[in-house]
Design a protein with these regions (language model features):
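Macrodomain-like recognition of ADP-ribose-binding/processing modules
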Residues: 1-246
Length: 246
């Protein structure tokens, strides 16, 4: 489905060329990732067992997500829109998600028919305006020359909660649980969490930061070797550091 976002025409032209070139030159890689990608539903069990405990290093970087993807088999968070694959990448809309799409086969994977029917279309039809807790996990997405597992998830619409912070915080925590569980289940010990300017969704940075802090210091403590928050927006970056007392 086409979005109504107004994108940059030059970027759109480059995006279309990049996507088509991937379709010609990376057929096997795209097919593998599509066939092995999975939608994790909101009612799935998220219990975890720590088989190889780590002394987790948590890092905060005031940058976009791409420069922080350096380790093989990294898990990468793609905070996305649930209604338009690639956040209207082909329409020229520039975002953190489009940066990932412009440097990998991610758009070619997310635009597959299986995800349109299982994921995006149901949200366009308003089946769940709050987007539930579904995420898409896509393996073997090469970014910066290393293979990664990408978790595509969206944040809830703040307006759905009518200013009730307690309800929003509960939902944010559920979403964070699903994201971290998916990385743990797929054996990613190094994860890069790209966090954009949360003011776009009227979400208080402190609330999302607290949600990650609660889980990384309890349920997912020692599950990961490194957790890197890539946060280009300065106010959000500051709030995340405060939540972790760094």
């Amino acid at each position: 489905m086409k979005s109504n976002l107004k994108g940059d025409k030059q970027f759109a032209s480059k995006a279309i060329s990049y996507m088509m070139n991937n379709e010609r030159t990376k057929i096997k890689e795209i097919s593998y990732s599509i066939n092995n990608s999975q939608v994790y539903r909101k009612n799935a069990n998220t219990s975890v067992v720590c088989l190889h405990p780590y002394s987790t290093e948590i890092k905060f970087m005031n940058s976009g997500v791409l420069p922080q993807i350096t380790k093989p088999n990294s898990g990468v968070l793609n905070i996305a829109t649930y209604k338009f694959e690639g956040n209207d990448f082909l329409g020229g809309f520039i975002s953190e998600e489009s940066d990932l799409c412009f440097n990998s086969i991610l758009y070619n994977v997310l635009s597959a028919d299986k995800f349109k029917s299982e994921f995006y279309n149901m949200h366009c039809k308003g089946v769940d305006d709050n987007f539930g807790n579904e995420v898409i996990y896509s393996p073997k997405i090469e970014i910066n020359g290393v293979e990664c597992g990408v978790v595509t998830s969206a944040l809830p619409y703040c307006s759905m909660f009518g200013g009730k912070d307690a309800n929003l915080l509960f939902t944010l925590r559920e979403r964070v649980d699903r994201i971290l569980f998916t990385f743990a289940l797929n054996c990613h010990k190094d994860i890069v969490l790209g966090i954009y300017d949360l003011s776009l969704d009227n979400i208080k940075p402190s609330m999302l930061a607290e949600s990650f802090s609660v889980y990384l210091n309890d349920k997912y403590k020692n599950i990961f070797e490194t957790v890197t928050f890539a946060i280009p927006e300065s106010k959000t970056y500051k709030k995340f550091k405060e939540a972790f007392n760094t």
